[in-house]
């Protein structure tokens, strides 16, 4: 197959767009902030098809299962994996902040902090209890779930729909074939929309730099650097070890999904790359049923980057305000973070709301301390989203391997750049 000119490769276009966005935001901030609709529009185009794609993928995957017990088995293994790896992420964030101490030296008096800027986040977090979260999974109507784009609600509907089709067998084949055909159409739409990724990345990055400015990063560079370094260590060491045990290289896997990562980098939303990630994982040898169950669930239950961020941000605020936390308080923080992190999603800003929910149950630390990181949260959200998407990709491969539904030949071909897996134009490799 003839190799594309480098300027036609999607990830090259996205890199160029991000660089141009940074330059425009730095030198022409007023004009750059007007570029926000470009980023918002791209994310809306992607979110437009996320719900239907999840529904169709899960339904066809479950409908094709001969053993319905497999649905519960796959879900159980995925949740077990999520909890174990999420705990590692929380502990790593805690340990890194203790070792590098990014908040030491600020010496801020909590009484001087104005909490008005974070009041809206605190209000949203206050209403998020575990019971509310579980009840929220049940939609008011099927139509409402799709209209609001609620991933877990759509997943619940798809599980029920697919289970009934599997029970019907041949009698439901017409519906299954229709949904399978619809899946192909939806991924075709994604391929078209993905071509607009450079425009979306340019708009989102230009707005971010134009609104907040590079200068806003300087006082808190140590925290940003600590977070990025910790996330890299998590991907290379924790996820890298898991990948090696499973039989693949984390470096090659990251390279394989580089286009999706660059889209996430430009938009700060891991949801922006969800459809492409699901397709890439199928092409890498993961079964459709496992992809359909693990990836959407992971977007609420397996947010490794958000977990690192939460424990690190809480300890940073404590260090900056000279508040000492006992080990018992830190263990309580871990336990609470395990619950509150499940309410976060792949959308920009959700991590900050989750942080507010976590701080609310640690009364020693003032909620107003969140203003210290409000200005840089937007710059940290990119790293959160990047870590989240890599974590969900690795989780899907691992669960597929556990289920013995991983085509290792396809995986090897995908990660080494050989074979048929790169024939799809959207793959860009």
UniProtKB/Swiss-Prot annotation:
One of its GO terms (biological process) is L-aspartate transmembrane transport. Keywords: Cell inner membrane, Cell membrane, Membrane, Symport, Transmembrane, Transmembrane helix, Transport. One of its GO terms (molecular function) is succinate transmembrane transporter activity. It is a multi-pass membrane protein. Its main location: membrane. It is found in: Cell inner membrane. Coiled coil: none annotated. Gene3D superfamilies: Sodium:dicarboxylate symporter. The keyword Transcription does not apply. The chain crosses the membrane at residues 9-29, 45-65, 79-99, 149-169, 185-205, 223-243, 308-328, 356-376. It holds the Pfam family SDF. One of its GO terms (cellular component) is plasma membrane. InterPro entries: C4_dicarb_transport, Na-dicarboxylate_symporter, Na-dicarboxylate_symporter_CS, Na:dicarbo_symporter_sf. The keyword Transmembrane applies. SUPFAM superfamilies: Proton glutamate symport protein. Responsible for the transport of dicarboxylates such as succinate, fumarate, and malate from the periplasm across the membrane. Belongs to the dicarboxylate/amino acid:cation symporter (DAACS) (TC 2.A.23) family. NCBIfam families: PRK01663.1, PRK13027.1. This is C4-dicarboxylate transport protein. The lineage of its organism: Bacteria, Pseudomonadati, Pseudomonadota, Betaproteobacteria, Burkholderiales.
């Amino acid at each position: 197959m003839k190799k594309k000119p480098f300027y036609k490769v999607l990830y090259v276009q996205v890199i160029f767009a991000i660089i141009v966005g940074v330059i425009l935001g730095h030198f022409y901030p007023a004009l750059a902030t007007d570029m926000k609709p470009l980023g918002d529009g791209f994310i809306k185009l992607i979110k437009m098809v996320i719900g239907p794609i999840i529904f169709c993928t899960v339904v066809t995957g479950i409908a094709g299962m001969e053993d319905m017990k497999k649905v519960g088995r796959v879900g159980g293994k995925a949740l077990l994996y999520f909890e174990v790896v999420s705990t590692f992420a929380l502990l790593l964030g805690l340990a890194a902040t203790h070792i590098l101490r990014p908040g030491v030296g600020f010496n801020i008096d909590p009484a001087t902090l104005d909490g008005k800027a974070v009041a809206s986040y605190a209000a949203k977090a206050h209403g998020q209890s575990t019971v509310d979260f579980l009840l929220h999974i049940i939609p008011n109507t099927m139509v409402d779930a799709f209209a609001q784009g609620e991933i877990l609600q759509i997943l619940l509907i798809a599980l029920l729909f697919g289970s009934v089709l599997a029970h019907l067998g041949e009698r439901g084949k017409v519906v299954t074939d229709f949904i399978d055909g619809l899946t192909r159409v939806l991924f075709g739409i994604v391929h078209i929309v993905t071509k607009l990724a450079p425009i979306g990345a340019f708009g989102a990055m230009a707005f971010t730099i134009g609104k907040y400015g590079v200068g806003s990063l300087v006082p808190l560079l140590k925290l940003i650097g600590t977070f990025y370094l910790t996330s890299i260590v998590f991907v290379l060491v924790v996820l890298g070890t898991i990948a090696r045990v499973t039989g693949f290289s984390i470096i090659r896997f990251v390279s394989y999904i580089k286009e999706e990562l660059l889209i996430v980098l430009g938009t700060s939303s891991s949801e922006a790359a969800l459809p492409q990630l699901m397709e890439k994982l199928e092409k890498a040898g993961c079964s459709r049923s496992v992809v359909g169950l693990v990836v959407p669930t992971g977007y609420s239950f397996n947010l490794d980057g958000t977990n690192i961020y939460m424990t690190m941000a809480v300890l940073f605020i404590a260090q900056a305000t000279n508040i000492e936390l006992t080990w018992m308080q830190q263990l309580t923080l871990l336990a609470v973070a395990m619950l509150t992190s499940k309410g976060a999603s792949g959308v920009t800003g959700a991590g900050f709301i989750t942080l507010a929910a976590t701080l609310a149950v640690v009364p020693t630390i003032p909620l107003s301390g969140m203003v210290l990181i409000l200005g840089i949260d937007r710059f940290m959200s990119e790293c959160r989203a990047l870590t989240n998407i890599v974590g969900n990709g690795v989780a899907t491969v691992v669960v597929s391997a556990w289920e013995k539904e991983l085509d290792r030949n396809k995986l090897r071909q995908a990660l080494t750049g050989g074979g048929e897996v790169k024939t799809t134009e959207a793959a860009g490799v």
